[in-house]
Structures are given as C-alpha cells and as structure tokens.
Regions:
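Short, solvent-exposed loop/linker segments at beta-strand-coil boundaries, enriched for Pro/Gly
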Residues: 108-111
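C-terminal boundary/linker segments immediately following FHA domains
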Residues: 113-164
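Cys/His-rich microdomains that often coordinate metals
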Residues: 29-40, 52-54
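Short domain-boundary/entry signatures in modular proteins, especially
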Residues: 15-24, 51-60
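Short cysteine-rich clusters marking metal-coordination/redox-active sites
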Residues: 24-28, 43-49
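Asparagine-centered strand-capping/turn motif at beta-strand->loop junctions
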Residues: 102-106
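Terminal C-lobe "cap" of eukaryotic-type protein kinase domains
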Residues: 2-22
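N-terminal beta-hairpin/loop module of FHA
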Residues: 53-95
Length: 164
C-alpha cells in the first residue's frame, strides 16, 4: 500500500506544476489555463481581454507564452522544484512591434530551431522569435515546439465569404 501513495517529491512536483499553470493577466483575469478560451489555430485567449497565449509543448507538458510571461528554472532548467528563478522572458521585438520572442536570462545556452531549418545558439541576453514551427532546446536538452494549425486557403475563403 505504501508504494501507491504519492511521495513528498511527487506532491512538490504537482504543486510546482499547478503554480506554473496559474495565469494572471494584466486585465485582472486570474485562473488556471483551462479557463483560457481555445482558438481554432491552437492558441488560447484570455476570456476577459483576449490576450493571446501560444502553446509551447514537449509532447507531454506545455508552457503558455504571452507578452509579459516568464519562464522559470522548473520549466527550462536543471531544478524541477525551482519555481522562483526566472530563466526566460516573453518580450516584444524592439524593431518589429507585434513580434514576440523568448529572451534567455539564464546562465545556460539554449538552442533555437527555426522553421526554415536554421539552428542558432541562444546565450544569455539573446532570444528566439515566437513563430509557428519554431523549436527551442533548453539547458537539459528537452525540445519544446510551437505548432499552430494552419488555415487552408479554402477554409480562409469560406471565412471571408461569411464576413462579407
């Protein structure tokens, strides 16, 4: 019976995951990510102001990226219990307004994989744009991907006809 009970480490990991899943939007919305509204393209929106969250996934877990969000050591680094050390920031590109990226503020070097096949090391102070098809490999070597649903031309034409 004892082996069926969650260990202290299991409980701590669960609490850290719950803390990372809790969202506080600038508009005043507070809640877990399941309360965000799913969009057709795979993104999520704040139910109060419509702020868009982009899902970065490793196949099992996801990190929701949006302007002003932070990534923590428990998500990107070597310590799965550290929910206090910031390792990444979601920031707007200074030259291209409306384009956001993940800025590395950790001591480690990340690796970015771009949709066109380019690979780039991302040291402290550098970043990778949040583009559909991009991937990032954090310090531990785990690859996280952003894959949104592409609208087909036929579907887009149908939507255009409905709005006319």
């Amino acid at each position: 019976l004892r082996e069926l009970r969650p260990t202290e480490v299991d409980w701590k990991q669960l609490l850290v995951r719950m803390a990372m899943d809790y969202k506080s939007c600038h508009c005043g919305f507070h809640g877990f990510s399941y309360r965000l509204l799913p969009k057709e393209n795979g993104t999520f929106a704040c139910p109060k102001c419509g702020k868009i969250y982009y899902p970065l996934t490793n196949g099992m877990d996801r990190i929701l990226l949006a302007e002003g969000e932070k990534l923590y050591e428990c998500q990107t680094g070597r310590n799965p219990m550290d929910k206090d050390t910031v390792t990444g920031l979601i920031v707007e590109n200074r030259q291209k307004k409306g384009l956001y990226g993940i800025k590395n503020v950790s001591q480690g070097v990340w690796r970015g994989f771009y949709p066109d096949g380019k690979i780039k090391d991302i040291p402290n102070g550098q970043g990778i744009p949040i583009w559909n098809g991009m991937s990032v490999r954090f310090e531990l070597g785990e690859e996280w991907n952003l894959r949104l649903v592409q609208q087909t031309e036929e579907r887009k034409e149908d939507e255009d006809e409905q709005t006319v």
